Amino acid sequence: MERPHPSSIPTTPGVYLYKDSQGRIIYVGKARNLRKRVLSYFRDGLVITPKTKAMMNHANLLETISTNTEKEALLLEASLIKKHRPRYNIVLRDDKQYLLFRIQKGIPFPRLEIVRQSYKDNAVYFGPFTSGTSVRDTWKFIHKIFPLRRCSDKVFNNRIRPCLYFYLQQCLAPCTEEVDPKDYAVLIQKVELFLSGKSKELVELLQKDMLYASEALEFEKAATLRDQIQAIKHTIERQSVVLPEGGDMDVIGIAVVNNGLALGFLFVREGKLLDGRTFFWPGLELDDGPELLGSFLSQFYSPISSIPPRIIVPWLPESTNNKDEISEDTFETLKYVLEDIRNSTVRIEVPKNIIESNLVDIAVTNAREAVQTKLGEPMSAKLAKVFHTDKPIFRIECVDVSHISGTNTRVGMVVFEDSQPLKNDYRIYSTTEDNSPFIKGDDYAALASWAKRRIQSGPPWADLVLIDGGKGQINAVQRVFNEHHLKDVFILAGIAKARNEEGRVDRRAGNIGDKIFVVGRMNPLTLKEGSPELLFLQYVRDTAHNFVLGKHRKARKNTALLGELLRIPGIGQATAKLLWSHFKTVEAMTCATIKDLEAIPGIGEAKARMLAERLQSLRNQ
């Protein structure tokens, strides 16, 4: 790529995008001064990392986006990296949100919820946690010793008698006012102490309550409190205290492992090591460490994150003009962004004492051991060998078609990155939306319709597009891709199901009868029976099949319910549309109360009573 003329680049803060010859974004960067940063790439004698050198060799086009401040540039950079996943950026591949406990404030009888997002609402959050199993086990443990309500708000507001948990002495039945709000508030206070890690204060409080109960001759209550104390003490014994003085912080360690960089992340809350996580980026060197650290922090934390007051990092960057390093100015900007999210002070700093240094060492050790344990040859490299390509097959988009006797045709697409499902990118396509009446029962036309709409969505493109089908299906898709000059952007393949002697589909895992067809190849690929590559491709195919089938069943159920609605006297198309637009799902509609129905404009009290009765009968069918 030729050096751009300085006058073509603004001197404002902003984001710059390098694109390849096909227009794909291959790198996104941010700068306080766009002209100064971009021109630095073309300075003679500049020492750059191999990754940056490779990026410049592939770059064909430069675009810039100006922002008002460097903070805005940092946020835009993180957003573009998450959206486009450029090849030469350090991308945080794990987009899933961590789990949190949530307790709503301002209501008399809140429940303990498990959520993936936190908001600036009238609630308190505890976490984060990475393991769904451990979170659910903790939730069960809390309900076992603290009898909170478990039901949803809708069930709670409509219950007229206590549930089974009340009779098992695992719920105080606030739904039927069996407990005073003040007593329930005390219970919530104890749960908050437990989740905050303040177990010592909680035990002292319970011991006082037990003493008062004994003095009042309430021996059954005292026995319950005794059991709670014993259960909590047993839990405390298993917790690892890493900060004797307490405190909340996240700790990061970075290690060079197996020709790549591994990052270990520890969650420390109330002085206790709550949880941990490891990440790995192959192909990075130690010189990429500063960029990795800055990219990770800007992508990992978001407006729905749980951000502690301190983030301990292995090093802080020095002020530098080398564009391959993240400068202290960038860290300062990142600090301001995190403080805006947290609405309080955030310090990004190196360890201050031997205890914190040891925590960084633990994070490094965890990262190194996790990578060495899990890392054989990655599946992306194995699949590259299967499909005879030099480029690792990192992103896979798999497509399947479902219909019933040619009606309600749906095309489902699932996405895998780094061998993991990327559920936020799953999509369902209703092929009737492009006004193609000939599609009924025609899988080829449905797939062609999907291909057109997938192209309209744009990048990020897959390394492998996998179709649930054979040569006919992949040829239908290939024609569309060729028309839009996308022939060489990705590999297009089909996986055809094996069939038994009776001609029926045989879905046995690893079955060698499953054939994998590739565009441009006459014969199917030969994969060893039961090989990891074949098992993985079958798993991806089956995931797509189950996804579209589940959506199709839901659509059929909704269609059936619509027919039932129209058969109810007094309900026409207009009322049916009102119900659909208000409730969105079958479950919500059939659980609607008279009060819920009356709230819909155009439905009066008499009609609401009639609808509630009929919808209830539909739910019981």
Swiss-Prot record:
Annotated GO biological process: nucleotide-excision repair; SOS response
Intrachain disulfide bonds: none
Record PROSITE patterns: GIY_YIG, UVR, UVRC
Pfam families given in the database record: GIY-YIG, HHH_5, UVR, UvrC_RNaseH, UvrC_RNaseH_dom
PANTHER family xref list: UVRABC SYSTEM PROTEIN C, UVRC/OXIDOREDUCTASE
Family: Belongs to the UvrC family.
Function of the molecule: The UvrABC repair system catalyzes the recognition and processing of DNA lesions. UvrC both incises the 5' and 3' sides of the lesion. The N-terminal half is responsible for the 3' incision and the C-terminal half is responsible for the 5' incision.
Designated name of the protein: UvrABC system protein C
